[in-house]
Amino acid sequence: CIYERGNLAMVKMIGRHGHENRIMDLFRQDPDVHFVLCDTYEEVIGGSDLVISAITKVTENFVTDEHFKEGCTVIPICTMGFQNCDLFFDRVFTDEIEQIRGFKYFDHFAPVTTNVADVLNGAAPGRTDNVQRILVYNYGIAIHDLVFAANLLARAETPDTPYRYCRKKHFIRCF
């Protein structure tokens, strides 16, 4: 989870199996990133501006509604643990409505659902105020490929673009 403090990005994590140390090592040289290790999901999610979760197996919601501050954005790579957000978040963004149509609370959040591509193309507004809680069910059907390809192309057009070969595997687990 991430929240801002001035120009600093504060990254809150729960430590599991030493993964948190590898993540901190990746960013140790960046003076604008600070890490906070937490013991509970309430500590991690409470007060965070951005919540990203890639957990694949959970049987209940991580936290109760009051831990999601106004203005936060939640991006669950796997949607488990965040079903309560379906019921009270102000906006839901998705890249493919058909993939979420079968969700338990789809009928509740369908009226506030916006396609991510529509936002990127300017056909629909993104965040319209600083208090909206936004849930992003983005499975990356093709939009990620297009963004990465555009960035790679732009960098390839720049002479002497530095490239550092990855020699280690990094698996980042926030929860």
Regions found by a protein language model. Give the residues of each.
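Short, well-ordered alpha-helices that flank and scaffold nucleotide-derived cofactor binding pockets
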Residues: C1-E4, A154
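A general structural motif
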Residues: L8-M10, G71, F89, Q132
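Short, glycine/serine-rich, charged loops/turns that create anion-binding
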Residues: G18, G81, G140
